[in-house]
C-alpha cells in the first residue's frame, strides 16, 4: 500500500518527511534493540524511572516575578497555595541581565519598564524580602540568574540569605540556570561578558556547588531559549549537547571535579514543548537517548544516576497569540501533554496572556490547573512511556536523534559551540528558520487559528495585559540609596576588591561573591567590575 497517497509531502518541524502511516519495517534497525529496554534502563529514552509518574509526579514549576521583591514573594506564595510544587524567581531583566543598578543611565531612561519582567533585586536585602516566608529548605527553588553574568550574584544572594536564616547549604535543594542560549543567542544584551569568561563563571559555579551544595543543580542548559529563537527540535537537541560538551571539557581541563560528578551537575536541562506535541514527546525521548550515548561514547560514563537525563520543560511562549487569547489555554494544554508524554521531570505552562504581558494572577493559576488536571483527571500518570512501541513514535525518535547528531557535528566543524556563537553561525541558523516560519504563516502553509485563519472581527473575550506595579523603579531607587548609606562600607569595599582580584586571576569567583553578598555589595557594583576586567562580548548581531 502506498504510504503517501497524495502528491504533497508533509514535514515535521525538524524537516523530516512524514508518512501517512508507519509500520514495523520503518523503525531503523539500530533502534530495535532500544525498544526492548524498559523505562529507567539504558539508553533511557523510555523514561527516567520504571514507575514514572506513579512514584513521582512531575514538578509544577512556574516562572514568576514582577515589580518589587515583595510583589514577587506574594505571587510565589499564591502559586504554592494553588498547588505549585516548586518555584522560580525572576529578576528584573533591565537591571539583572546587564548587572546594572537602577541609577544606571540606561535604566533611568527606561524607568517605566523596570519591574515588568521580574522583581528588582540589587542587593541581598532585596533577595531576603523576596524569599521571606518561602520554604527554601524543603521546596525546590530556582534562584534566578538565567543570564550568565547575572547568575553568580543571583545564586550567591539566595545562598547567603539561606545561610543567614540557619539553613545548611549542604542540604539546600534547588537549581540555577546561567544559560548560554539565552545570554548569547536568544536575548543578547547590550553589555555582557564574552563567552570565555562566561564559560569560566559556569565552571566556577559547578565546582562551588560540588564542594558546598551537593543537592543544587548548578547550571541548566536551556534548549528552550534556542528553540524560541528559531532553532528546530533537532537543532535544539544538537545545540544543547554541544553546549554540554563545552562545560564537560572545561571541567575536565581544570581537573578540580570528578567528571562523573560534573556530568551529573550538567544533567539537569530544559527544553521547549511546542504545539507539534507528538514530535515534542519524541524529542524528549531522543534527548535521554543522546545524553546516554554522549556520556558513554565520549567520556566513558555509564553510571545510571548520571546517564539518565533530567528534563524540565516549558511550553512555547512564542506560540501563544494575542488574537483570541483564550485559545492559548488549549495550546498550553496540548504542549504540556507532549512534554508529559515525553516523560519530563518538571513543567511550566506559559500563561494564556503570554503574548500580551507577563502572567496575570488568573493566567498563572490556570497554568497550574492545566497541569493538575493532567495529573489528577486524565490517567496519564498510570503508565510509563505510554507512546512507547508506536511505529511512528519509535521511528521519529530515532530520526530526531540522528538529525540532532548531524547538527551537533556541524557545530563542531565551526570550532565548537562557543565559536559558533562568537561567529554568529548559530544566529544565522535561527534567523533562517524564523524567516521560513514567518513566510509559511504569511502564505498559509502554517495555520494559526485566530491569526491567519478563523479570525474574529470582534474579540468576544478581551484580555487586558497585566502591567504589574508602577512603583518598582521609585522603591528600588530608595532602597539602593538606603543600602549604600547604611551598609558597612569598609567591608563592602574590601569584598569588592577581593572580587576584582579573583576575576583577574584563575581563582574561583564564588567565595568572593558570597563575601560580597554578606557585605551588601550591589549588583551594579559587581557589573562594573565585570566590565572593567572582562570587557563586553563582541556580538555578531548587527542592529
Ranges and model annotations:
Residues 1-280, 298, 305-312, 340, ...:
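Catalytic alpha/beta active-site cores
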Residues 2-6, 10-29, 37, 42-44, ...:
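Flexible, glycine-rich loop/tail regions that form catalytic "lids" or insertion modules at the edges
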Residues 56, 106-109, 136-138, 182-183, ...:
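Short acidic (Asp/Glu) and glycine-rich catalytic loops that position anionic groups and cofactors
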Residues 66, 75-82, 124-134, 157-161, ...:
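Generic, well-ordered alpha-helical scaffold segments in large soluble proteins
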Residues 70-73, 121-124, 152, 196-199, ...:
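Electropositive phosphate-/nucleotide-binding environments in soluble metabolic enzymes
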Residues 112-116, 182-192, 228-230, 271-276, ...:
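Short beta-alpha connecting loops at secondary-structure transitions
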Residues 122, 150, 162-164, 187-209, ...:
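Phosphate/diphosphate-binding loops
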Residues 261-263, 301-314, 323-355, 359-384, ...:
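Flexible glycine/proline-rich, aromatic-decorated loop/lid segments
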Amino acid at each position: 500500500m502506498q504510504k503517501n497517497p497524495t502528491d504533497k509531502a508533509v514535514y515535521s518541524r525538524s524537516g523530516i518527511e512524514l508518512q501517512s502511516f508507519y509500520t514495523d519495517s520503518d523503525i531503523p534497525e539500530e533502534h530495535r534493540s532500544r525498544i526492548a529496554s524498559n523505562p529507567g534502563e539504558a539508553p533511557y529514552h523510555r523514561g527516567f524511572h520504571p514507575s514514572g509518574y506513579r512514584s513521582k509526579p512531575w514538578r509544577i514549576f512556574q516562572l514568576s516575578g514582577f515589580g518589587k521583591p515583595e510583589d514577587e514573594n506574594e505571587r510565589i506564595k499564591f502559586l504554592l497555595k494553588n498547588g505549585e510544587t516548586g518555584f522560580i524567581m525572576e529578576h528584573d531583566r533591565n537591571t539583572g541581565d546587564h548587572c546594572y543598578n537602577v541609577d544606571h543611565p540606561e535604566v533611568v531612561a527606561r524607568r517605566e519598564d523596570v519591574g515588568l519582567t521580574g522583581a528588582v533585586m540589587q542587593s541581598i536585602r532585596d533577595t531576603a524580602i523576596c524569599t521571606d516566608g518561602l520554604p527554601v529548605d524543603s521546596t525546590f527553588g530556582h534562584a534566578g540568574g538565567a543570564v550568565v553574568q547575572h547568575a553568580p550574584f543571583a545564586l550567591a544572594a539566595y545562598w547567603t540569605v539561606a545561610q543567614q536564616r540557619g539553613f545548611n547549604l549542604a542540604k539546600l535543594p534547588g537549581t540555577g540556570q546561567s544559560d548560554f542560549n539565552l545570554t548569547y543567542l536568544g536575548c543578547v544584551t547590550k553589555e555582557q561578558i564574552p563567552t570565555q569568561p562566561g564559560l569560566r563563571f559556569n565552571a566556577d559555579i559547578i565546582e562551588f556547588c560540588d564542594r558546598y551544595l551537593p543537592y543544587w543543580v548548578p547550571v541548566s542548559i536551556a534548549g528552550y531559549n534556542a528553540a524560541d529563537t528559531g532553532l528546530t527540535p533537532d537543532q535544539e537537541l544538537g545545540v544543547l549537547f554541544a553546549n554540554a560538551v563545552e562545560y564537560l571539557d572545561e571541567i575536565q581541563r581544570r581537573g578540580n571535579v570528578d567528571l562523573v560528578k560534573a556530568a551529573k551537575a550538567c544533567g539537569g536541562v530544559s527544553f521547549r514543548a511546542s504545539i507539534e506535541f507528538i514530535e515534542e514527546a519524541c524529542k524528549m525521548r531522543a534527548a535521554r537517548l543522546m545524553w546516554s550515548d554522549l556520556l558513554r561514547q565520549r567520556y566513558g560514563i555509564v553510571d545510571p544516576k548520571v546517564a539518565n537525563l533530567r528534563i524540565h520543560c516549558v511550553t512555547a511562549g512564542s506560540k501563544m497569540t494575542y488574537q483570541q487569547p483564550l485559545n492559548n489555554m488549549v495550546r498550553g494544554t496540548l504542549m504540556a501533554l507532549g512534554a508529559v508524554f515525553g516523560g519530563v521531570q518538571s513543567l511550566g505552562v506559559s500563561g494564556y496572556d503570554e503574548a500580551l504581558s507577563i502572567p496575570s494572577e488568573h493566567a498563572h493559576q490556570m497554568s497550574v490547573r492545566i497541569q493538575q488536571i493532567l495529573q489528577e483527571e486524565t490517567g496519564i500518570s498510570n503508565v510509563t512511556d505510554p507512546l512507547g512501541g508506536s511505529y511512528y513514535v519509535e521511528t521519529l525518535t530515532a530520526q530526531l536523534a540522528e538529525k540532532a547528531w548531524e547538527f551537533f557535528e556541524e557545530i563542531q566543524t565551526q570550532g565548537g559551540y562557543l565559536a559558533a556563537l562568537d561567529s554568529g553561525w548559530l544566529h544565522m541558523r535561527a534567523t533562517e528558520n524564523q524567516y521560513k516560519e514567518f513566510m509559511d504563516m504569511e502564505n498559509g502553509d502554517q495555520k494559526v487559528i485566530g491569526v491567519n485563519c478563523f479570525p474574529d472581527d470582534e474579540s468576544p473575550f478581551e484580555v487586558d495585559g497585566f502591567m504589574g506595579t508602577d512603583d518598582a523603579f521609585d522603591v528600588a531607587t530608595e532602597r539602593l540609596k538606603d543600602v549604600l548609606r547604611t551598609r558597612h562600607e569598609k567591608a563592602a569595599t574590601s569584598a569588592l576588591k577581593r572580587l576584582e582580584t579573583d576575576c583577574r586571576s584563575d581563582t574561583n569567583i564564588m567565595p568572593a561573591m558570597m563575601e560580597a553578598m554578606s557585605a551588601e555589595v550591589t549588583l551594579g557594583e559587581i557589573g562594573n567590575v565585570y566590565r572593567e576586567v572582562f570587557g563586553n562580548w563582541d556580538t555578531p548581531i548587527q542592529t
